[in-house]
């Protein structure tokens, strides 16, 4: 019978992008790493974009080619957002791209190589979204790169996606350097059991032998002269090895890509599975369950019936979706009970009892303004050590990464994946005694 006690170098709490990046960075440094998680995290809900930084200084009509690159955009965010993690880590922003390349390289089966500039990928709601990189199955739909007409596809009789709405997003950014576009409906999935099929069901059907090829032939029959690429709903397979987009493209004769996903998200599950596979291949042990009775490094913590003792901890447990921040009378970090603070705005003064205030009192009427509640989290120093209410380091071998770190709103400010990768990479290296 195996021992119930695990001794390791690094315990990572949380299994989303920040936690996985931290674990893989620590593992690369030779550390024995254990991940403890309650659930997969918000990474499995992602729509396919890896958002790192978009230029805060550009105007809406600034052409794609004139916008700042990803790292320069992060520097501009650091200069204008005093509570943002990029501002806190501004002296190390020259390593941001190392972190992004590391994380995307670890997940290269799913993620396209980053180029240094933002790609512009359509959303299902008719917007063009900037992303430092995206799924490989989406890269062919980069609005800044398509030369010719972009064919925006939906499925005849299926109510899940509106190609006219999606194509309208491409038309709006055409003056910025985007392509002409036109919507079409493909005669697929019309029989009763598939006309209301869930995205995951459609993705599995397209993986079947011959299915992607037939879909490519259906697409080819409706193409016109000048059509340069096609984007479809984000259902082009769950398994990257099925190569659904590539198989379709061979038959269609033009590049085939997906647009971004809403929930439920096939790309999110695809990315989650890639993370799982990479952690297993790297030798990271994953324990399912809450961390209980854990007081920090060198002390035993109970995780899913196992006792874990680690020299260093990385808190990468997320915020509200991931469960890293809880409200039990007041906002608290859920593992070590660390204080939750606002990082900017009227509640940034540590003397204000921010965490105990009613939620309605820590939101702002202006929806475009930074929201104190949605950006709440741990306050950290420039080494990513969590701080207590008096601004003191909680423990020199406890680090924080990802959404549990306050000062940014991953859902709205366009830096969620970037903060996760950057802080995860830095925290993982530091936890393994490989200072970045």
Where do the model's predicted regions map?
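A glycine-rich dinucleotide-binding beta-alpha-beta segment and adjacent secondary-structure elements
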Residues: 285-287, 309-316, 320-406
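Feature captures the FAD/FMN-dependent oxidoreductase FAD-binding
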Residues: 85-151, 264-301
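Short hydrophobic core segments
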Residues: 10-13, 34-36, 291-292, 307-320
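Helix-loop-beta segment of a Rossmann-like dinucleotide-binding subdomain
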Residues: 83-84, 140-160, 180-183, 192-201, ...
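Helical element adjacent to the flavin cofactor pocket in flavoenzyme catalytic cores
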Residues: 166-174, 209-231, 237-292
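A conserved FAD-binding loop/helix module that cradles the flavin
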Residues: 24, 47, 322-334, 395-396, ...
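Conserved N-terminal glycine-rich FAD pyrophosphate-binding loop of Rossmann-like flavoproteins
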Residues: 38-78, 191-203
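N-terminal Rossmann-like FAD-binding beta1-loop-alpha1 element of flavoenzymes
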Residues: 9-35, 424
């Amino acid at each position: 019978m195996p021992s119930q006690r695990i001794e390791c170098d690094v315990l990572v709490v949380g299994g989303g992008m920040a936690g996985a990046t931290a674990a893989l960075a620590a593992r690369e440094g030779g550390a024995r790493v254990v991940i403890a998680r309650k659930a997969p995290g918000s990474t499995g809900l992602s729509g396919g974009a890896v958002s790192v930084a978009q230029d805060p200084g550009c105007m809406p009509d600034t052409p794609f080619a004139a916008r700042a690159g990803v790292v320069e955009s992060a520097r501009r965010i650091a200069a204008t957002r005093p509570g943002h993690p990029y501002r806190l880590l501004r002296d190390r922003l020259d390593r941001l791209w190392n972190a992004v390349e590391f994380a995307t390289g670890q997940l290269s089966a799913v993620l396209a190589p980053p180029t240094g500039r933002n790609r512009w990928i359509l959303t299902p709601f008719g917007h063009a979204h900037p992303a430092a990189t995206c799924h490989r199955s989406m890269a062919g739909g980069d609005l800044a790169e398509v030369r010719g007409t972009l064919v925006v596809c939906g499925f005849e009789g299926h109510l899940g996606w509106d190609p006219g709405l999606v194509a309208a997003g491409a038309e709006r950014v055409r003056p910025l350097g985007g392509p002409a576009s036109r919507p079409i409906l493909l005669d697929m999935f019309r029989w009763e059991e598939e006309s209301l099929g869930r995205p995951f069901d459609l993705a599995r059907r397209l993986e079947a032998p011959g299915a992607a090829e037939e879909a490519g032939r259906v697409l080819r029959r409706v193409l016109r002269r000048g059509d340069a690429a096609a984007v479809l709903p984000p259902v082009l397979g769950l398994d990257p090895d099925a190569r659904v987009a590539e198989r379709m493209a061979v038959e269609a004769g033009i590049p085939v890509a997906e647009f971004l996903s809403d929930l439920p998200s096939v790309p999110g599950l695809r990315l989650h599975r890639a993370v799982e596979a990479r952690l297993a291949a790297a030798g990271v042990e994953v324990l399912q369950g809450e961390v209980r009775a854990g007081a920090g490094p060198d002390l035993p913590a109970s995780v899913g019936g196992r006792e874990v003792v680690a020299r260093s901890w990385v808190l990468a447990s997320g915020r509200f979706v991931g469960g890293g921040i809880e409200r039990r009378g007041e906002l608290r970090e859920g593992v070590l009970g660390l204080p939750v603070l606002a990082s900017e705005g009227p509640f940034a003064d540590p003397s204000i009892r921010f965490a105990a205030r009613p939620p309605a009192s820590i939101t702002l009427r202006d929806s475009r303004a930074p929201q104190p509640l949605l950006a709440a989290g741990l306050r950290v120093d420039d080494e990513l050590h969590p701080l207590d209410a008096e601004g003191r380091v909680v423990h020199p071998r406890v680090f924080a990464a990802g959404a549990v770190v306050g000062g940014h709103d991953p859902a709205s400010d366009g830096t969620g994946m970037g903060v996760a990768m950057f802080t995860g990479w830095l925290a993982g290296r530091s936890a393994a005694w490989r200072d970045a």
